[in-house]
Amino acid sequence: MLSNFLKVNSKALGHIRTFASKSGEIKHNFKKADTYLCDGPSDSTVTNKDELISFFTEMSRFRRLETVCDGLYKKKLIRGFCHLYTGQEAVCAGLESAITKDDHIITAYRDHTYMLSRGATPEEIFAELLMKETGCSKGKGGSMHMFTKNFYGGNGIVGAQCPLGAGIAFAQKYNKTGNVCLAMYGDGAANQGQLFEAFNMASLWKLPVIFICENNKYGMGTSQKRSTAGHDFYTRGHYVAGLKVDGMDVFAVKEAGKYAAEWCRAGNGPIILEMDTYRYVGHSMSDPGITYRTREEVNHVRQTRDPIENIRQIILDNKIATEDQLAAIEETVRDEMEKASEKAIAAPLPQARELFTNVYLQEVPVRGVEFVNSFKP
């Protein structure tokens, strides 16, 4: 978890705490969210040195995690599907800061950073990607099927996680927990019929679910302009309120997330958040990402809207830290991820008997299973 990371690496951050203690509160303005059937949050917030350093560190960890994944895949140590989150870090960091660990998240196949934000260790994530027994799913889930407490994956079927998210929210309402569920999906899933069915049932039963469309502009290699008749995804719930948010500004995401969580906890039912974001990489590792868009387009977003660079600039402008101090944080993050990947590479593969675990909750009476049972622990 980030809190533990900051404690362990207090040496690298110590000078920053001392230097920044004089700066106090900092007001940050961002693009106001477009609204539909609701008022929406403010277009400004007050932050401080601790939150700024925390966001910078966490998003740096997200990006370095995915950079290491990219390298492991190219070395053919990671096999199969692998979808990276590079460029979209502000969405994950901002939403996580807007809710509690008792709240729930379910997403699609770009799930590595959500595992990290929910409390999994980098080693558990890398080990799962490498199909090792120390992985978070014991090597059986791979890139798309990672799970930890109050995080339900990683789902490989486009849009299928949204009805599940409504179901998780139904459980919260039924059990009167007061918690909410974030159901993440991309613009490529925004036309799936099951999504609209989930909108309907969630609205009918006023379920505490926040449907979050991470609009990174491309569903695989198809631009949203070529696949969707209506581009305002935050209005497509018809009777469900919605917001369109600058998904590259972590504070805009945080404030929208807080507004949405309060909306749901107040018993208003579901709400849709459309995150205007961008992925720098291809759809998956098998996609170079430049056959359907130009390098100039990608570089323009990197240079003008990068979420980590935006935070870096706020920190420098307000004299929270120096370039050297931020570089020290990044170096610590690199070391953390490299060491975690080395441990994951060295970890053993799962035993054959692991194939037969976690299949049924209770023993199932089946004849002729002596051979299979011989592999069980």
Swiss-Prot record:
Its cofactor is thiamine diphosphate; Mg(2+). CDD domains: TPP_E1_PDC_ADC_BCADC. Mg(2+) binds at residues 187, 216, 218. It holds the Pfam family E1_dh. Its main location: mitochondrion. One of its GO terms (biological process) is pyruvate decarboxylation to acetyl-CoA. GO terms for cellular component: mitochondrial matrix; phagocytic vesicle; pyruvate dehydrogenase complex. It catalyses: N(6)-[(R)-lipoyl]-L-lysyl-[protein] + pyruvate + H(+) = N(6)-[(R)-S(8)-acetyldihydrolipoyl]-L-lysyl-[protein] + CO2. It comes from the Eukaryota. The keyword Mitochondrion applies. Thiamine diphosphate binds at residues 109-110, 156, 158, 187-189, 216, 283. Its EC number is 1.2.4.1. GO terms for molecular function: metal ion binding; pyruvate dehydrogenase (acetyl-transferring) activity. Tetramer of 2 alpha and 2 beta subunits. This is Pyruvate dehydrogenase E1 component subunit alpha, mitochondrial. The gene is pdhA.
